């Protein structure tokens, strides 16, 4: 039974969920007893009067423990970079939360230091995948039968190191970073790997920050991440199974089945954490959790060569990030012209849906000041964002067959 990946994955899922639920209860009591709770909250971002002050934070510790224990028990430590990612981002987020809670500095870790930490981990992962002899694929190719001229999908017999990744809506589902850099002539292979490492750094940094921005309402980030983790686990499974890889016309990645166990533990930890993080939250994951889950999603997608599916799969994270970027740039543009202006009532975009008219700045021009016309309770906003992520997850899976 131990050789069956499905058996070990289910065990990892259940144990992660149970650890998260059991440990969470005791962790919340400990944090309350020590008074390690939210102490700095702007009432303006809480239009429904939900009392956030006094709720323990740093719940990401629960998530990290719930992921690591099942992976160490039921997984093989071949994919050590997933464990490294979890610990690295956990420490980065913990440092940020520590400064906020214990040093009473609401800004936390300096943004440049946070970005630097994310980029360093991205660089480590990118270089590891470049240097490791185990990071190989068997490329999917299309051949035409001589008898009936029909096309069939086969995989090359020898595993190779490759910069090929899965891309949606293209006929053969593949994109090679090396081919993109073909203009470099004899140096295209080195240039292709350099581009791959750069993309790795950007993806990990972007997804980690996107998850961090999405963590603004009770249960929001945990629910969205559980859905995304489920899809990535499914993609890891079909990538590790040569028959499924043939059917879906995607590359076969030997050894990626162990990532299914990690993804299962990740989903279990998220669902278990929701037991306490669902509205009204008894604990917040803090940056210890949000940075970690974003980093895990980014690294997992890169290892299974599905990072170009993330703009669709993590569409909610993408929209949250873009809303903040556009809001800041539009505000700066107006400031240079001496005009106080904003695109949205508030960002990240999920906050835009719960702002009351009385909370708007009367001296500011809002491009979308009438959208939406009325405020929505945060629990309903959260569920609607989950539904959006479910739809995006379904579309992501569908793209594997749309060419």
Language model: regions and residue ranges:
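Juxtamembrane helix-capping/reentrant segments at transmembrane boundaries
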Residues: 41-55, 106-117
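Individual transmembrane alpha-helix segments
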Residues: 170-202, 208, 382-385
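Alpha-helical transmembrane segments
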Residues: 1-30, 35, 63-91, 120-146, ...
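Flexible loop linkers connecting adjacent transmembrane helices
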Residues: 30-47, 99-102, 106-107
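Short juxtamembrane and helix-loop transition motifs at transmembrane-helix boundaries
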Residues: 42-51, 81, 104, 180-189, ...
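Extracytosolic (periplasmic/ER-lumenal) interhelical loops and adjacent juxtamembrane/interface segments
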Residues: 146-186
